[in-house]
Amino acid sequence: MRNNEFVFPKDFLWGAATAAPQIEGAYNEDKGLTVWDVTADGNVRYGENCKVACDHYHRYKEDVALMKKIGLNSYRFSISWARIFNDKTQTVNENGLNFYKNLTDELVKNGIEPICTLYHWDMPVLVYEKGGFLSDEFVSLFGNFVKTVVCALSDKIRFWITFNEPQCFVHGGYEGGWLAPFQKNGKFIVQKIMRTVMLAHGEAVRTIRKYSVLPPKIGFAPTASLTMPVNDSAEELERAYTQTFKGYAGQWGDPMVKGVAAYGADFLSKEDLKNICEPLDFYAFNVYRSDNSSEVYKQGMPRSALGWEIVPKSIYYAAKFAYKRYGLPIFITENG
């Protein structure tokens, strides 16, 4: 091995990630409606929707076979809450739950580690109509959903992610209006929603630890624009690190991991922070782009179809900065 080579350990997890509304389809089969099902029409640029998608609900065995074929040893998927509780009685929908049992069994049978995301943007309409994140009931409703899933699947699943990209579904869905349910609200409403999501995260962590059959590994999966250093001088690294966590990364991560309200999260009380900050086993990070105030850095960078600069080394700095701040094992749970 050359000195500049890094050898990944044998138990390193190489995987892929999806979300229920992105791939499952079967939107009205063994499932209640979600906010994406009822608000996407007229709000998505090219008219895409979640009705059929990849038809993963009916073709999951083929999909798992493809995962095995390309050599994945882990797979992150999300549970559709509306598939577990699909009517107003709050009775468990066994057909929906059995889908996830069967999927998990198929993954394990093929030597693929299942990693479960409990919320990936798709609030059930039944919960939304109760007030959603603005309802005092949300935390207990989410806790009951988590308990149901954990009791059913934790004999096979070790890795749990409470929320995927709260920065996106809160600020994109309720402030900027570019994600479901496509609302534009003021600061007070957005802060109230942030508080609810963070409290629900804490409740989910406690619930997983209480009911899990296998010893659980728990985290959450934020995303944020990483500020790239222009060079590796100590001063520049510190500037980039500080700037990264002045935004959404610190606003969400500090309360949930450190129990500290910083960078625009000062609306949280000490009691809130106590309930939000439960010990985590890893810090997940979805890394899609870098950011830098210096346009000089961006000149000549290749760009994605979304216009985002492609900087492979951003994954290195994301992991480096996240570990420096939170001291937890790092999962890169999405990248692109």
Task: List the predicted regions and their residue ranges.
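Active-site region of glycoside hydrolase catalytic domains
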Residues: R2-V44, D87-T89, L97-N335
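Active-site-adjacent substrate/metal-binding segments within catalytic domains
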Residues: E24-Y100
